[in-house]
Amino acid sequence: MSVELLSILVLFGVFFLLMFLSVPVSVSIGLATIATVLLSLPFDNAMFVTAQKMITALDSFALLALPFFILAGNIMNRGGIAMRLINLALVLAGRLPGALAHCNVIANMLFGSISGSAVAAAAAVGGTMGEMQRKAGYDPGYAAAVNIASCPTGLLIPPSNTFIVYSTISGGTSVAALFLAGYLPGILMGLGIMVVAGIIAYRKKLPVNERVPLNVAVGAFLQAILPLSLIVIVIGGIVKGTFTATEGSAIAVVYALFLAVVVYREIKLKDLPKIFLDSMVTNAIVMLLIGCSSGMSWAMANADIPGIIEDAILALSQNKVIILLTINLILLIVGFFMDMTPAILIFTPIFLPIAQSLGVDPVHFGVMMTFNLCMGIVTPPVGSCLFVGCSVGKVRLAQVIPYMLPMYIAMIITLLLVTFIPQISLYLPQLLMGYGG
């Protein structure tokens, strides 16, 4: 058996064995990396090199944006913006059949993009919208399914921490281009879910909302304009080159603090230490994942694992369509069992070179990969948003899955559109910043 093949077996064998034993993901990655490096280096050298690669990976200016965006998201999450966005979404949903379901989708798109967390969107928006839909006579399983399926849209609509992680692991893909590239796919995901929700609502003859008076509509817009301005200020500044993504993330924290503490007064000064601590813990978890995954990426490159996997996939077919479908299928399966961040960190170094050899732009591939893995957080057996959505909706999984199935189909169709129509991702970066790959 060749050293390269043995490295593949050891790396993924140890990793999945430890995952099966419920060892934390970052620890599983680190131990699998060390086990693989030991095949070619003595113990002392293996430990030193692995630690060195982990620390070097974190020595990145771009990664400074992550803790600030995480903190800004936590502040906005607790700053009373959910209800303001829901009121605006009620106006935007209009008098469509199942308008409250459409409102849920729109609110998740808005809230998720501001908070940067699909789980936070599922909890904050779903907790309020679920009760409103229940009182309006909606099936609780249907209401929960709409909330669950739409909460990942905020991971595509910037600012997105996921894109920052992808930018780092992919060798410096433009964060600004990734942010712009996520808009249309995120909106398409939301629209696909709204179409399915609308068809179900029409068949079930769900009630239509009363017409919203003009003064109420204007009031809802004015209430939501300040939180939404965060997106305009941060993304606009990054795209125009006024400031970097890291500087933009710091501005987001200052703006979020101003809204939550001074304008809305939903957060007291005594609440800030707890918010800072929670943000530090979340950031530490993410940074540990990035460090360990970067060590694994180096170990894979050292053993030429990406090259071996590339040769194996290309041996199956030279057809670009078949290869992209194969990559999507593998990522869908990975998403069933692994969270988005470690999946991006582990599989980007494997699949991105293959995609680039086929002429796929790294920004387009990053959006495709993120969209694909978004489905993993709303599917069993480990989908975090699926179980949070069931919890806040006070429903069992069996009540939700029948409604989720057509939404999964809509998401897969949209994924295929994003995969095979690159301009869905690349149009805005090319239009607004002259991106050329």
Show where each model-derived region lies.
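Alpha-helical transmembrane segments of multi-pass membrane transport proteins
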Residues: 1-437
